[in-house]
UniProtKB/Swiss-Prot annotation:
Cofactor annotation: Zn(2+)
More details: The reaction produces a racemic mixture of D-glycero-alpha-D-manno-heptose 7-phosphate and D-glycero-beta-D-manno-heptose 7-phosphate.
Protein name, per record: Phosphoheptose isomerase
Keyword terms: Carbohydrate metabolism, Cytoplasm, Isomerase, Metal-binding, Zinc
One GO CC term, this protein: cytoplasm
Protein function: Catalyzes the isomerization of sedoheptulose 7-phosphate in D-glycero-D-manno-heptose 7-phosphate.
Amino acid sequence: MNPHDRIVQHFHESIRTKQMAMDALTESIADAGHLMAQALQAEGKILSCGNGGSAGDAQHFSSELLNRFEMERPGLPAVALTTDSSTLTSIANDYSYQEVFAKQVRALGQAQDILLAISTSGQSGNVNAAVAAAHERGMAVVALSGKDGGEMAGLLAERDVEIRVPSDVTARIQEVHLLAIHCLCDLIDQHLFGGA
């Protein structure tokens, strides 16, 4: 297949996956946006975590809340647990990589907070440990996942919200995760501040 055809194929696959996700995920994204907005109204914050590209997504989400998304508004409290290399490496060295997010959740998380847990497979041990730690702290969890939801799906409590992308392709899952993050940011802004 020539480069042009490969590029077109990627676009078509992305469009198909987003169309399936639109049908399958609208309600769960709306539920997650409402849950997050309620937490922020109750003076809670949103902690986020993930590995690799999902770490970048966690940081992207936090930056949109802390700064602004598409409207002028005050900053909102959000912390990406993926950014402090001293903390991450000290926890990994002294305990294990499995604990790098969970220890931060236990230190920073309160019952009114939300954990945004991002894993394309649901099999990321350190993200799953963070989900368990969030529950220990009385927090709700919004899980961005894909494939069959993996181990993370089985860890979720009744009040948690899973946004599971209907795909087995990591790149397509990541593309929908970014769109879902933008939808969540918009829903939070609309809920808290009304129309732009």
